[in-house]
From Swiss-Prot:
InterPro entries: DNA/RNA_pol_sf, Rev_trsase/Diguanyl_cyclase, RNA-dir_pol_PSvirus, RNA_pol_HCV. It catalyses: RNA(n) + a ribonucleoside 5'-triphosphate = RNA(n+1) + diphosphate. Belongs to the tombusviridae RNA polymerase family. RNA-dependent RNA polymerase that plays an essential role in the virus replication. Keywords: Nucleotide-binding, Nucleotidyltransferase, RNA suppression of termination, RNA-directed RNA polymerase, Transferase, Viral RNA replication. Pfam families: RdRP_3. It is an enzyme of class 2 (transferase). It comes from the Viruses. Its EC number is 2.7.7.48. This is RNA-directed RNA polymerase. GO terms for biological process: viral RNA genome replication.
Amino acid sequence: MATLPSIHAFWKLWWPTFSEERKMTVVQALRNGLTRKLFQITQIAQQILRWPPYIRERMTSSLGQSLVKTFQTLLGIRKALSRLCLTRNMNVDIFTMLLIPFKFLSQLCSQIVASANFVIQTFRHGLSRGLCLARCRNPETMRSGWSKHTLQMQNCSSTSPLMTPFQPQIARDLSNPHGLWMSTRNKLTRTGGSAIQQTSRYVRLAVRFSLLAAGAYISCVLARKALKEYVYRWELKSDQELPTREQSQISQVEQAMEQNGAMMVMKLNGPTAPILSLQDCLTKHVLVPEIVDEEGTVTQKEQSTFLIREFGPAVRNLVTLAKLEFGGIPKKTTANELTVWRFLVRKCEHANMNPTDSRTAISMALPYVFMPCRTDVGRASIPLRDESIEICRQYRAQFVEETPLRRVFNNPLSGKAWRNWVRHLGGLDDPALFQELKXGCLEEWLGVQSRRTRARHPKLRSHFKDTRHKTRRVFRIAGLGNLYEFGVHNNSAVNLERGLMERVFYVKDDKGELVSCPEPISGIFWKNLKGFRNSIVHHVGHRHPVSRETFLAYYTGPKRTMYEKAVNSLYEMPVSYDDAKLKTFVKAEKINLTKKADPVPRVIQPRAPRYNVELGRYLRPVEHPIYHAIDKIWGGPTIMKGYSVEQIGRHIENAFRSFTDPVAIGFDASRFDQHVSVEALRWEHSVYSRIYGYPELLTQLLRWQIHNRGTAYASDGAFNYQVDGKRMSGDMNISLGNCILATAITHDFVTKLGIPARLINNGDDNVLICPAVEVGRVRQELYRHWLNYGFEVISEEPVYILEQVEFCQMRPVFDGTQYTMMRDPRTTMSKDAYAVTPFNTPTAARRWMRAVGECGLSLTGGLPVKQEYYTALVKHGLDPKNIKQGKDFDSGLYYLSKLSNRKWQEVQESARYSFWLAFGYTPDEQRALEEYFKSWTPTFEWSTTGILAEIPECLLLKHNPLPPT
């Protein structure tokens, strides 16, 4: 016990006087000393293999004393180093490096005890089984007997507790090892036959190994007993032995961290201090008192702040909250430090803490977030596995074929096997003493089954089968982002029924009840939007439909093949009403399960390709002319169909800068397709009919969209339904029609208000840009105006910064030369790591990675964070071949990427500033994320279906920063 005061005095008195070079010399010497202490355990354990039985007792005593001395020395040094770190005289990186040996002590003890118990039971069972089999001459019987014995030992090892004491009979046998061996040999000799040669080697090994494990077990018990006594005495006498400490903030922090176990001292006796919440550690300080008049009205609000009354518990709470938030001990990187700092700042701001005290407390708490406490070490000693079943059977997993223990049993004459086991027993598997196991990055998740709806509709007939539904799967590349969890809906009867009920027939009101969609005011489309329709027809002019062969030229790949078959069949039989019937299924899309745990499945309702060919001959030729006509009506580019991300960014910039004091108000029509009424469809159809002069075929094709009949099939059920109106998600005019309706209704809105405005539209996504003085009128009247047309819109918060204008989940970011639209990295870093494309093999996964990386890089070259994200996918991927032509790859990312051709380039500082304005990541956080993606090295191995791969990820990937206002 005399080492503690001297060690403390050394750090207290002499350490500040040392030069930096001498400090590093002392640190290196300490490190070497800790390593030598751990190697002493291994060296003594190696002697067990050579010493005769009569000196086992002496060996056990030596090993026990060595363990006790090692624990005592380590605890003393740990205490001194903790004080040193608190006084800020040592770099935290050096301190963390010196703490590595402490992380492994608990695992070392557990392995010694587990090995001892297992080997002792193996010896007893193996001896009895060997005596029985020795009397049997039949080789088949011996082989089956040993197989049963192996199974019995596996079951025994999986249920044995770690700290089971010796049984009396086993203890008596081990107390006289020479007599045990002689009696066993005599028994085997009496059985006779060749069985002696087959079992002698096994029994000899079992006896030798049992003695080894027994010595290790006894030493561990002695060490634990001495450690408990030592810690107990240290707790009672430390205040008397150590110099008097000043009652300062540092001492408060040290006491609080000891109570929480951060000093890794196991407090086995005595009461612990009550754990205070963060608010209990603060005291309120009123800056401006509240003033109330005689009538009780508050004329002046109180202004106050909170000061830290007890720094120790406050810092302890901050450390605990950070570890709970980030799942234990984060890896000490610059990115993680920035993330933890931001988290702690938000906690202090939420508590209305004084800024000066907040900075002091955060500076003290930050190093401890990256240091293991008692509970952290216990968690870290459990090896991370790819599969949850391995975690549940971690004790049994020590005895599979690959473990050092099993290698010794299988190769008893191998010196390498014995050396590896001794190193494993001493906790020296790795020079770093502790590291997380590498796990595969490929995950497979089963499809999502939503809850069954209770709603019923008279026009929907259900037919459920007593069979299982087909399960879809979604795949993920772990390590790229885990802020959001995504899934995919199964094409099951339950999902189909709910999708039809809540996305076709009913909508939810303010109370969450299912009601019918609101109907527009009768005649409002023909009364208010007649001029808008006439303007479109005037700018487009009279047109003629194209031939079927010309229509095929609009498509390539699988879609062209499908429409070619439809064209051939139309020459044999004309289009009919049966071709207009709907074939409904659940869309296989990536759904965000973090934002909404049980979203309503989205259904796709396509008509026959024959119908699409005939209608497409009329609509495809006039689609872009109608877009240009709408642009002329609005006075600038309005419909963002067919533009690249650079062109969209330029159009939004021009629209935003066309006003002196602009404001952008985004609004999204809630379930736009579902709210399209019969009157809205008829008004939209009148636009096409007037352009083509009301041809009979076009009129008939459009009339079939008014009264719809459909069927939906799944392996466990089928549905028949009828519905009037609505926009069917597979129709040829879904995009064109939505753009016409949205721009027309919004144009009527700004005309009635009499305000100058520009609209950015892409169907149901809208951004209205107008002078800031009009924001109140716009937000007040917008919902009411759209409701008159039968639509419900959700208005977003107005933004006054160009980079924060959100359109189609993208924001404009300046790349150094121009503005380009960038998908939100807070969502896409998680979403782009998921795939509905099957990963049948790791090679298929790497081909998919390369395809996504190439598409993403063509959109984000020269932009912060996402450029390195997609570069990492390209770097670790393989040639994608024809993956991009598959139907599973049909997405907005792919279509946008075909319009851009950006390449990798250095990120400009102006781009980092613009990126911060858009998404809230500071330039330092951007660089930290980029460094993470540059150093990301995936292991293409599988985890079990539905089990996380447990890949350690950068904490910034789970960080959702708020952009500046």
